[in-house]
Amino acid sequence: MSAEREATEAATVAAAAEARAETGAGEGAPSQPPTVEVASDPQPPPAPEASASASAPPLRCLVLTGFGGYDKVKLQSRPAVPPAPGPGQVTLRVRACGLNFADLMGRQGLYDRLPPLPVTPGMEGAGVVVAVGEGVSDRKAGDRVMVLNRSGMWQEEVTVPSAQTFLMPEAMTFEEAAALLVNYITAYMVLFDFGNLRPGHSVLVHMAAGGVGMAALQLCRTVENVTVFGTASASKHEVLKENGVTHPIDYHTTDYVDEIKKISPKGVDIVMDPLGGSDTAKGYHLLKPMGKVVTYGMANLLTGPKRNLMAMARTWWNQFSVTALQLLQANRAVCGFHLGYLDGEVELVSRVVTHLLALYNQGHIKPRIDSVWPFEKVADAMRQMQEKKNIGKVLLVPGPEKET
């Protein structure tokens, strides 16, 4: 979708929002998910009193109804009512939303930041503002924004704090905006805030073909003479080379520690560790003096569509620990990063987003989209990511599946 077309859509949505507002106040759209499934309730919802809402189609959303496999995320609907955001909030129509490993872990009951079930997942998305609440002066109906939220983005219409929205550059598509925040904030803060990436450094990027991995590769290219080791299956190596990986490593057939030691006997300066378990220890022992391992995930917990108790036990048993004295003697650092626990650090996150948008406008970064799936195909989208078939970001879009 071109930026011009999206701008036209934004104007249309803004006009629609004003028209709805003139019909009178109504109940605000609930932020918690509905409980009526499309497939199981063919009867239309009761018509609201407002005439504009009476003819509006129901709003679609995805809801996690229980912990387990792909079928636990259901497509549901709720009646459309005039948006009524509270003070400091905005309501937007969602055009695209991101799929992240946290969503996969949440489905299995392994993500501690997930609100109680049933809940609409989704930490990020992009769309058009349709209404603003009291006290909001920096957003207006028609603004194209991207959103970073604790959950709830996998739905057609959502109300969020205005402070958690960011204006999109004119040239940015909704798909790019939905692919930017979680992956690029994570990669940026791991590499620069924790890693202090500088010219001449070397970096190990695990899962280099994933969303965070591809973001990290682009960010590494903004610094001169950075050597990048990237792990991924062999079929993805050519793409990794095209995107700045100096030494791709097939983790299926090769011990990445041995491969790195052959090329760089002293190791690397930064290890980006989304794996956890024994891989954190391996990363620590790969560090040069003054090196840093930054752990930001537990992907080793995910070995299938459902929770694997053996994998959980193995990962936790192999969890890495180190004493302060050992760190002192080794001249190394171990850091932890969890974007979900920075949801109250508005200024900190906004600073990073400002840097990222500047890099986007300068042409230094551009989210790579692996695939875009309609809400009906959410199970296929999750499978694509969990089986590590993706190169770049996997996205969801609210619109119904188009007939071919």
UniProtKB/Swiss-Prot annotation:
The species this protein was found in: Rattus norvegicus
GO molecular function: oxidoreductase activity; zinc ion binding
Top-level EC class as recorded in UniProt: oxidoreductase
Matches recorded under SUPFAM superfamilies: GroES-like, NAD(P)-binding Rossmann-fold domains
Annotated stretches, region: Disordered: 1-55
Upper classification of the organism: Eukaryota, Metazoa, Chordata, Craniata, Vertebrata
Biased composition range(s): Low complexity: 9-24
Name of this protein: Synaptic vesicle membrane protein VAT-1 homolog
Residues with Phosphoserine modification: 2, 31, 40
Described function: Plays a part in calcium-regulated keratinocyte activation in epidermal repair mechanisms. Has no effect on cell proliferation. Possesses ATPase activity. May negatively regulate mitochondrial fusion.
Keyword annotations from UniProtKB, A to Z: Acetylation, Cytoplasm, Membrane, Mitochondrion, Mitochondrion outer membrane, Oxidoreductase, Phosphoprotein
One cellular-component annotation, GO: mitochondrial outer membrane
Source species, domain of life: Eukaryota
Subunit-level organization: Interacts with MFN1 and MFN2.
Gene3D superfamilies hit by this protein: Medium-chain alcohol dehydrogenases, catalytic domain, NAD(P)-binding Rossmann-like Domain
Enzyme Commission number, as recorded: 1.-.-.-
